[in-house]
C-alpha cells in the first residue's frame, strides 16, 4: 500500500501513513535541510518588500554618487523592511548592492573628471587593508565610546566648511610628492579602519580630506572619494560573502537599482558642479550630526 512520508521531528524516522488517493507522495520539505521548493523561491522573488527596497536603493545610489551618505538611506531601509533577518545579513546585503553603485559612480567620474590618481590609489590601497583591521576589532571596542568623537569631528568639519567660503570652490591641486603620498596613506588607513569598524560619514570625511590636503574642489573630491570608498566596500564584502551573510534575492535587484541611482546622481553632480555638491555636502553633514547626536545623547 502506498503512503505519505512525514518527518516526526529532527533526526526521527519517517512514518508511513495511508494515502487517501492510494499513491505514495514524498513530502521532501519535511526533511530538515531540504531545499526550498521552486514556488517558494518565486514567491520570495515577488516579495512585496522588493519594489520598496529597490526604490530605496535607487535613491541611496543617487545621493551616494553625488556626495556620499547612501548608507544613511539604504541601511535603515533594510532594517525596517526586513527585521526578521540578522543584522549581519542586512549589513552584507547593503554592502553588496552599494558596491555596484559605487563602482558605476567611480567609473563615470573617472571618465569625466581629472584628479590626481597616485594619492587616490595610495589612499585606496591603505583603506582596503585597514578596513579588515577595523572589522576584526569591531567586537573589542565599544561603539558608544566612538560616537562623541565622531560627533565632535563632524561639527568641526561643518564649521570649517562654512567659515571658509572658498573651501572646495576652486580646483587648486597640489604637487604630489612624498609628503602628499604619506598623507594619502595615513588618510586611507584612518578612513579604512573607521569604515570597517563604524562607518557613518565615511564619504563626507573623504571629501573633506581630499579638499583640505590635496586642493581639490568639491566635484573632484567627490569623484576621488568614490575610488577609496569602493576599496573599503570590496574589503567588507570579502567578509560578508564567504560567511553567507548576503540576501541575494534582495541584494541583486537592489544592486541594479543602486547602479541606476548612481548613474543619475553622477550625471546631476557633473551638471551642477561644485556649487551643487557643496550644498549637498553641508546638508548631509547636518543630517549626520543630527543622527549622531541622537545616538549619543538619546539613551
PLM feature spans:
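Short, strongly hydrophobic alpha-helical membrane anchors
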Residues: 6, 10-51, 299
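Lipid-exposed faces of alpha-helical membrane segments in multi-pass integral membrane proteins
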Residues: 55, 59, 100-103, 125, ...
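Selective hydrophobic functional segments
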Residues: 92-145, 233-276
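Hydrophobic alpha-helical transmembrane segments in multi-pass integral membrane proteins
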Residues: 133, 190-198, 236-244, 251, ...
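Membrane-interface alpha-helices at helix entry/exit sites of multi-pass transporters
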Residues: 85-94, 118-122, 215-226
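Selected transmembrane alpha-helices and immediately adjacent juxtamembrane segments
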Residues: 4, 36-86, 171-222, 252
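Transmembrane helix exit motif
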Residues: 104-114, 135, 151-176, 287-299
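Cytoplasmic-side transmembrane-helix entry/capping segments in multi-pass membrane proteins
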Residues: 116-126, 174-180, 223-228, 276-282
Amino acid at each position: 500500500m502506498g503512503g505519505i512520508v512525514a518527518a516526526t521531528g529532527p533526526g526521527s524516522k519517517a512514518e508511513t501513513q495511508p494515502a487517501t488517493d492510494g499513491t505514495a507522495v514524498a513530502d521532501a520539505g519535511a526533511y530538515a535541510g531540504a531545499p526550498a521548493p521552486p514556488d517558494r523561491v518565486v514567491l520570495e522573488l515577488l516579495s512585496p518588500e522588493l519594489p520598496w527596497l529597490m526604490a530605496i536603493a535607487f535613491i541611496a545610489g543617487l545621493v551616494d554618487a553625488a556626495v556620499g551618505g547612501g548608507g544613511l538611506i539604504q541601511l535603515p531601509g533594510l532594517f525596517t523592511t526586513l527585521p526578521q533577518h540578522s543584522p549581519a545579513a542586512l549589513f552584507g546585503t547593503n554592502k553588496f548592492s552599494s558596491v555596484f553603485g559605487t563602482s558605476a559612480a567611480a567609473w563615470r567620474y573617472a571618465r569625466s573628471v581629472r584628479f590626481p590618481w597616485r594619492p587616490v590609489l595610495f589612499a585606496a590601497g591603505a583603506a582596503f587593508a585597514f578596513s579588515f583591521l577595523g572589522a576584526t576589532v569591531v567586537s573589542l571596542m565599544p561603539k558608544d565610546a566612538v560616537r562623541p568623537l565622531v560627533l565632535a569631528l563632524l561639527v568641526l568639519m561643518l564649521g570649517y566648511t562654512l567659515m571658509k567660503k572658498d573651501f572646495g570652490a576652486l580646483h587648486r591641486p597640489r604637487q604630489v610628492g612624498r609628503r602628499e603620498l604619506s598623507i594619502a596613506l595615513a588618510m586611507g588607513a584612518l578612513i579604512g579602519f573607521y569604515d570597517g569598524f563604524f562607518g557613518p560619514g565615511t564619504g563626507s570625511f573623504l571629501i573633506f580630506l581630499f579638499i583640505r590636503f590635496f586642493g581639490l574642489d568639491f566635484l573632484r573630491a567627490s569623484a576621488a572619494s568614490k575610488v577609496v570608498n569602493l576599496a573599503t566596500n570590496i574589503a567588507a564584502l570579502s567578509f560578508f560573502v564567504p560567511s553567507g551573510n548576503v540576501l541575494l534575492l534582495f541584494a541583486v535587484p537592489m544592486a541594479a537599482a543602486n547602479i541606476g541611482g548612481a548613474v543619475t546622481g553622477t550625471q546631476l553632480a557633473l551638471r551642477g558642479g561644485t556649487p551643487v555638491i557643496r550644498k549637498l555636502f553641508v546638508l548631509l553633514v547636518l543630517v549626520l550630526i543630527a543622527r549622531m547626536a541622537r545616538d549619543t545623547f538619546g539613551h
